[in-house]
Amino acid sequence: MAQKETGKQEILTQGQVKPPFTGPENDGSRPQADTPGPKQTEQANKWAVLVIVAIGVFMATLDSSIVNISLPAIASSFGVPLSGEIEWVIIAYLVVTAGVLLTAGRISDMIGRKPIWAAGLIIFTVGSAFCGFAPSLGLLIAARALQGLGGALIMAISPAMLTSAFPAHERGRALGLNAVVVALGVSTGPTLGGIITSTLSWRWIFFVNLPIGIIGLILTMRILKEKMRWNRGKFDPAGAILLALGLVAITLGLSFGQEWGWNSPLLIGCLATGVIALILLYIVEKRVADPIINLSLLHNRVFLSATLSLVLSFLALFAVSFMLPFYLEELRGFTTVQAGLLLTPLPLTIAVIAPFSGTLADRFGTRWLAAGGLTLACIGLI
């Protein structure tokens, strides 16, 4: 009888939904999805965590969309064209985020989520202040890279914080509400950025993050009780360096392909460096005890297909948001406020639908729901 119960428990453990950045097996510090606990404590903890995560995620997503709509004004302020250096205001953020994201998730597995989350809020808020006061385009780009570091820490562990706080049957709802926050940040950014840029200055699109970050940090320190620890395996510096090098090189190559020329030696060298680094990463990760990436996930067909679908859907739906502000303002003659309003419908629709999709996923599963959503997205693009 004991053996049967043990086998059942192992099946339940393997079937639990874990965050993408997993370290060793659950050592008891993360709540088991199927283990009941005191109801009052569960309710207080999970909703408090949701509020804290929502603040950080809203700040990070708001900043991404609010900067896009203000790029023409920033270029005009520093007297630079709309191509070339000004692109680094966006690319610096993306490059640092790409290089740090997975490493941040691994470190949080080792020392706990609270210190990484708090560090992310502090770095992002300080970076926002530096962006607002930047006297030159070069310093603005450097401050945006600092913001990217903070944003990577925030976005890397926000799903893990929610999946740890909520039981299995409520995770879809929690992640759906998190998607609402993401959509609200993206949808608020263009309109708010247009109003702020038109009435005040583009510098205030960064200052708006300061009160949000401070409030989030205060709540984090008062509500989250997790203490820093170092008991979940060793860090993999070689894997972290190769991962960062590979992702940064590929991101740079794809970002500047049109400007450098798709046949240029610089572009080919950049992409080749990225590919070689990722191949070496695969070789190294197979030989270390505590890899930065759990390669067994790549053999999980469900995880791999879901990840690829997510990447492709984001490319299809959100990649155009970078170019649309330039198209609407420079070619179509719309004001910054008008361009912001035209960019709002997509994320606003996501904000309305996401809570229902999360609940439906908890009840009926994700397979047909995701397929239906991607089908509707394809129809909309056509």
Q: For each of these PLM feature ranges, what is it?
A:
Residues P38-K46, R232-K234, W260, L295-V302:
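Helix-boundary and loop/linker segments of multi-pass membrane transporters
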